[in-house]
Amino acid sequence: MSTAENILEASDVSIQFGGVRALADVSFHVEKGQVFSIIGPNGAGKTSMLNCISGRYRPTKGQLFYNGHSLARSSINDRARLGIGRTFQNLALFSHMSVLDNIMVGRHHLMRNNFVTGMLYWVGGAQREEQEHRRKVEDIIDFLEIQHVRNEPAGTLPYGLRKRVELARAIAIEPELILLDEPMAGMNLEEKEDMARYVVDLNQELGKTVIMIEHDMGVVMDISHQVMVLDFGRKICEGTPEEVLANEHVRRAYLGEGDAPLQEELVAQ
C-alpha cells in the first residue's frame, strides 16, 4: 500500500528480455528527501530498474507508484511532467548546441507556447515565457558553477563538465525525484568530489529526492541515506550504509569467496 511519505514504491517488479530475467520480484520504497543508492556488480539490474522507473522499460510483472499513483499507464513524457528527471550512464547531450540551449531542452515540457506560436506572438506572452525559462536556466548554471562555459558547444567540453551539463538538463525539468545513472563514472578524484557535492546540494538545498546508481562505494557510503543491493536481478540487501556494509551477502556479491572484506575496500578508497 502506498503511503504519503514515500515518493516511490516498487512492488515485485520483474522484467525479462527473451530468456534473460533482468529483474526478479524487486520491492522497495524511497522516502521523500532521501538519497537512495542502488549498487551491485555489473549486470545486476541497476539500470534496468531506473529504466522501469523512468518509463523506458515496461515491467513484465509488478507495480510502480509515484506519490501514491500507479505509473502503469504513464509514458516517459508523462513521468517527466509528474516530476521524474533522469541522467544517463552514457551522455545524451546535443554536441553542437550550446550548454545553455542543451539545458533549455529540459524545460520543453514546461513551455506553454510551442515553436509556431512563439514565432507568431514573440512580442507578447511567448517572449515573456522564454525570458522566464532562461532566467531559471541561468540559476541552474550558477548552481552547478558552469557559467564560464554557458555559451560553448557541449561537445567541446571536458567529460566532467559534460556530466554537469547533463545533470543541469535533468534539474531543468523541475523534478521532485531525480534518477542519476552513474553520475561519477569516468571522473578523476577532483571531479568526483565536485559531483558528490552537487548531489548533496541537490538533495539538501533544492530539496530533491535522489535515486542514484554509483560504483564508487566511498561516495555511496558517504552521501546515501539508504542503500539497496542488487545481484543477478534480485534484491539481496537493503538498509542504511552501515547495515549494508556489514552484510555478508553484499561482501560475497561484490568480492566473492575468500576476498578481503568490503570494509577494507572502502578504507583503501
Residue ranges and their predicted role:
Residues 2-269:
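Glycine-rich phosphate-binding loops of nucleotide-dependent enzymes
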